Amino acid sequence: MADLQTQMKQAVADAAVEQIKDGMVLGLGSGSTAALMIKALGAKLASGELKDIVGVTTSFQGEVLAAELNIPLLSLNAVDRIDLAIDGADEVDPGFQLIKGGGACHVQEKLVAARADRFVVVVDSTKLVERLNLGFLLPVEVLPGAWRQVQQQLAALGGKAELRMAQRKAGPVVTDQGNLVLDVTMNGGISDPAALESTVNNIPGVLENGLFVDLVDEVLVGEITDGSAGVRSLEKRLS
């Protein structure tokens, strides 16, 4: 399964890069699929197939990778527009609402997605779900001095929140902003992402949560058909 998943991710990353045009300001996402997209972009810039591209990264990880590939970068504050943002997701529901933040980068990811004229999400087929939060935890970035209070407030909303602990250091995960992350499971999943996004963000001590509501324009899905990796495009239907 791991090899098939890699094939799906590569196919969808390559398809996303085909949407990039010369002269664009790009939002460069975070995570494994976005990393493949950044590598494909770097190859096209190196070969001359694309030119005059500027990237705005959503994480330190993405910044390091883009710099290694000689992709010109600017900060979010240095640009007045982003033509296209491409990023992955941890879960995508039928309404194109997302959970992001498995890499604890969701604050910057949401800032870039909200600024972009067009936001394209790249995922493999395992990320499509009927309801959010049944299989993946909802990340909530919190101020270090408030995580216990926020945890209690989330419990009052029906959520079980646990402080995310680091894997290769002692203590909790610390975000690029110097904050902590609570991973939340809502009882029964998330039935109303828009309402929960607003409610959680109104808790004192919360910087941002990993629900991305009404931001996505297109989802590119990598999938295996007859043993070969392909890509399916899902366009959001206008209501």
From Swiss-Prot:
GO CC terms of this entry: cytosol
SMART domains associated with the record: DeoRC
GO biological processes: D-ribose metabolic process; pentose-phosphate shunt, non-oxidative branch
Enzyme Commission designation: 5.3.1.6
Pathway linked to the protein: Carbohydrate degradation; pentose phosphate pathway; D-ribose 5-phosphate from D-ribulose 5-phosphate (non-oxidative stage): step 1/1
Catalytic activity: aldehydo-D-ribose 5-phosphate = D-ribulose 5-phosphate
Highest taxon above the source species: Bacteria
CDD domains in alphabetical order: RPI_A (cd01398)
Active-site residues, as the UniProt record annotates them: 109
MF terms in GO: ribose-5-phosphate isomerase activity
Pfam family, one: Rib_5-P_isom_A
Binding site for substrate: 30-33, 87-90, 100-103, 127
Keywords: Isomerase
Family statement: Belongs to the ribose 5-phosphate isomerase family.
Subunit structure: Homodimer.
Function description: Catalyzes the reversible conversion of ribose-5-phosphate to ribulose 5-phosphate.
Database matches in HAMAP family: Rib_5P_isom_A
PANTHER family: RIBOSE-5-PHOSPHATE ISOMERASE
Protein name listed in UniProt: Ribose-5-phosphate isomerase A
Annotated organism of origin: Parasynechococcus marenigrum (strain WH8102)
Lineage: Bacteria, Bacillati, Cyanobacteriota, Cyanophyceae, Synechococcales
